[in-house]
From Swiss-Prot:
Disulfide feature: none
EC identifiers of the protein: 1.4.3.5
Naturally occurring in which organism (per UniProt): Burkholderia pseudomallei (strain K96243)
Molecular function per GO: FMN binding; pyridoxamine phosphate oxidase activity
Residues at which substrate binds: 8-11, 66, 123, 127, 131, 190-192
The name this protein goes by in its record: Pyridoxine/pyridoxamine 5'-phosphate oxidase
Reaction catalyzed: pyridoxamine 5'-phosphate + O2 + H2O = pyridoxal 5'-phosphate + H2O2 + NH4(+); pyridoxine 5'-phosphate + O2 = pyridoxal 5'-phosphate + H2O2
Amino acid sequence: MTTLADLRTNYSRASLDAADVNPNPFVQFDVWFKEALDAQLPEPNTMTLATVDESGRPSARIVLIKGADERGFVFFTNYESRKGRELAHNPNAALLFYWIELERQVRVEGRIEKTSEEESDRYFASRPLGSRIGAWASEQSAVIESRALLEAREKEIGARFGENPPRPPHWGGYRLVPSSIEFWQGRPSRLHDRLLYTRDAASASGWKIARLAP
């Protein structure tokens, strides 16, 4: 019988070298993200968001990236959820993209800030009606007695707002402003390629690149 210790994959699809990447990590991220899209990976826009509470206990969950540019990586959520409360206490957070079919990871660390009200309004208005109603109906991370209560709340909100529910005041965007971005490419014998970008004011790109041991 196969045991967990016997499960392993030897990565061999590609390599990663500092001479071949863009000096700007946001441009390099865009290159890799487009390659994930071209490969038709399932939901390449998913990422793990890690936060910590006031006692230093970590928690992680999958969220969807909704924007990435020189300012940082954007996602939207309920500000009163567990992650929202933890980010209000400690804005340090980490993101992880894992594209297993390409044998790649991207690790991002930095500080969280809220997006502007205008950005949150604009994205909220673009969401499907059911998702906009759901943002009102769900008191995210709170204990509820049953799904029936959630569905009743959904109907109530739908009847109240009709086709145009406004953005709830407790719902909006966050932007992770990175201090470091690591690109990881799986290699044979676990000798993976890891390139770490960190901010460097003296560099023309504003970043420096270092190779890390696997």
